[in-house]
């Protein structure tokens, strides 16, 4: 009888302790949430004080994937099927894989100077294998090149353009002095697979990270924040693509005594909250 009574007292005591600890945890959770909101509000206030402006940045949490993809090897049949083109590299064989095409057009293809971007996109879509998978990245007049990046579900797979070894899913058109396309290089990713779904930082989180890391200058403007992917290990045959936010920031600086508008670009890992790259 005494044991049953003692057992009941212990059970009640533990229930009271659980309720007390649960209540304390709830209060702490509420306080943490409020502190987080205060910090977020303080950051936005500080950015405003530094005259850093932005519009339309998404603050809603989203989910996304890391992606795996394989580097495509082009077959002899695929290369021979390209009309009015000839290869500038050795053809594939049993002991020689071709993962980077270098092709020359039989006749140079003229591009309109007025509509060069549209004309170049149309050329890639119609003359190049899987051309619809590529989207214009930039026109480099100094190098006489037009660069396209491969996309996944409509989003850019961002890549370095200053090193051929980082060329994993690109088309580069080469122009002559008459604004004609004479040749191109191509690499392609294939067999895309989504890995486990994970939470992504928001567009606003990515911009605030830049601010935390002192990357945003006073009187600068966040012009855009676009979703895409970056290869984490571009030199491997199987690529792991991480979701990123590509942020464009604009500000003015004096060059030779004159004000000049400068654009700066940042790439932020949307899974790991890290700044991957900065360039102008």
Curated annotation (Swiss-Prot):
GO terms under cellular component: plasma membrane
Domain of life of the native organism: Bacteria
Keyword Iron: no
The UniProt record lists the keyword Membrane: yes
Membrane topology label: Single-pass membrane protein
Residues passing through the membrane, by range: 9-26
Topology, Cytoplasmic side: 1-8
Keywords linked to the UniProt accession: Cell membrane, Membrane, Transmembrane, Transmembrane helix
Major site of localization recorded for this protein: membrane
Extracellular face residues: 27-280
Consequence when changing residue 18 to A: Induction of WalK-dependent genes
Self-association and partners: Homodimer. Interacts with WalK and YycH.
Function (record text): Together with YycH, regulates the activity of the two-component system WalR/WalK.
Protein's name according to its UniProt entry: Two-component system WalR/WalK regulatory protein YycI
Annotated gene: yycI
